């Protein structure tokens, strides 16, 4: 225990004492009178100080409330980085999630833990195992997803969240309030009180509900029907593979509307670049995202893909990633859109752009 506090200024309250009966040891040592021992007196004081610190940090509390520090791995010194990787592997990406691992998931049974954090841990894939552990053993009984303007400093911090967990069970209903869907300048304290009383943007979920979602993410606003869809259906990732398309680095040279070139110079049925070469055609159908449209369409452009064009594209732009998937059947969507998600059929013989990520049937992918 004494060695643990050698880095107390660095690790702070992330230290979890190895001693189990701190209180008993303290009482025993405090009863000792070593004032007459020249060499023992100072050591006795240091041991008592370390044990008192250990007592403060032992997992004995029924309620823990914390606004932990926000620091990603890049901001940690080597000693601290090594410590959190060893002690808190699920939360090592940020100090705030290390504190969640340390205090939020190890306090007394039926204890409560309340935190103010950023919301990155709710959605990023790097926190998937942390979420799984938290949701499997605890109930989030209350959460306010604040978003911008969550601290008195104003709009400095984005995506804040405050939540309370209860240990032992993950089947208790929790109340979630959405405050992040408004402009950054809106005062969140008054909005919270308004939505709390009106029950607008207020949702109920159990922690167990989120365990059915990909990577155990926490989109608490999803409807019961949407949650059921995730629970009862096969994920697209199990039957298809989503790939990023190409960037030409010079769209004016390599991309045209199909109406701008001769139809006789477009090959619609290519299965490989060799087919393009044999056809003596320069252009192939090209999926480039486009406006909101469901199921079919937005196949208005063609791409220059002759052998000469292929050599140039192999060395500029993003250098033809996913080229082994070109000309295969699939479905694509627009990467950046202000509208709802929409998916469209990509026929065989087409090449997809980076603006149109494409899902391909795993069985057809060689």
Segments from the language model and where they lie:
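Short, flexible segments with low predicted structural confidence
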Residues: 35-36, 341-343
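Contiguous C-terminal substrate-recognition/catalytic subdomains in enzyme active sites
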Residues: 261-262, 271-324, 332
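Class I S-adenosyl-L-methionine-dependent methyltransferase module
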Residues: 1-59, 63
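Short Ser/Thr-interspersed hydrophobic loop/turn segments at strand-loop and sheet-helix junctions
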Residues: 287, 324-342, 351-352, 362-366
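Signature of N6-adenine DNA methyltransferases within the class I
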Residues: 55-273, 298, 309-316, 328, ...
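Short intrinsically disordered, low-complexity coil segments enriched in acidic
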Residues: 1-6, 291, 350-351, 356, ...
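Anionic group-transfer/hydrolysis microenvironments
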Residues: 69, 290, 336
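Short beta-turn/strand-loop junction motif enriched in small, turn-promoting residues
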Residues: 148-149, 292, 338
């Amino acid at each position: 225990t004494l060695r643990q506090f050698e880095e107390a200024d660095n690790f702070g309250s992330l230290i979890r004492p190895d001693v189990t009966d701190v209180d008993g040891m303290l009482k025993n040592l405090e009863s000792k009178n070593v004032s007459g021992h020249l060499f023992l007196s100072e050591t006795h004081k240091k041991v008592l100080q370390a044990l008192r610190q250990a007592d403060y940090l032992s997992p004995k509390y029924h309620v823990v409330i914390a606004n932990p520090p926000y620091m990603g791995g890049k901001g940690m010194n080597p000693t601290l980085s090594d410590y959190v990787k060893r002690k808190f592997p699920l939360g090592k990406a940020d100090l705030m999630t290390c504190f969640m691992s340390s205090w939020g998931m190890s306090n007394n049974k039926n204890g409560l833990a309340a935190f103010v954090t950023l919301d990155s841990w709710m959605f990023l894939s790097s926190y998937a195992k942390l979420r799984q552990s938290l949701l499997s053993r605890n109930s989030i009984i209350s959460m306010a997803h604040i978003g911008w303007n969550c601290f008195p400093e104003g709009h400095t911090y984005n995506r804040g969240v405050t939540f309370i967990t209860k240990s032992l069970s993950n089947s208790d209903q929790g109340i979630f309030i959405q405050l992040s869907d408004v402009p950054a300048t809106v005062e969140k304290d008054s909005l919270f009180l308004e939505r709390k009383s009106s029950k607008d943007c207020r949702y109920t979920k159990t922690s167990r509900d989120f365990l059915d979602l990909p990577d155990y993410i926490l989109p608490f606003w999803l409807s019961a029907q949407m949650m059921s869809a995730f629970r009862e259906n096969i994920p697209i990732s199990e039957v298809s593979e989503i790939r990023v398309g190409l960037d030409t680095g010079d769209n004016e040279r390599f991309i045209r509307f199909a109406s701008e070139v001769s139809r006789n110079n477009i090959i619609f049925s290519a299965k490989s670049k060799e087919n393009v070469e044999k056809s003596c055609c320069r252009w192939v159908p090209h999926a480039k995202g486009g406006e909101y449209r469901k199921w079919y369409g937005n196949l208005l452009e063609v791409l220059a893909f002759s052998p000469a064009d292929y050599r140039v594209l192999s060395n500029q732009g993003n250098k033809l990633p996913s080229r082994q998937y070109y000309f295969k059947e699939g479905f694509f969507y627009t990467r950046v859109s202000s509208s709802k998600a929409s998916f469209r059929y990509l026929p065989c013989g087409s090449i997809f752009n980076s603006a149109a990520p494409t899902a391909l049937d795993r069985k057809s992918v060689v």
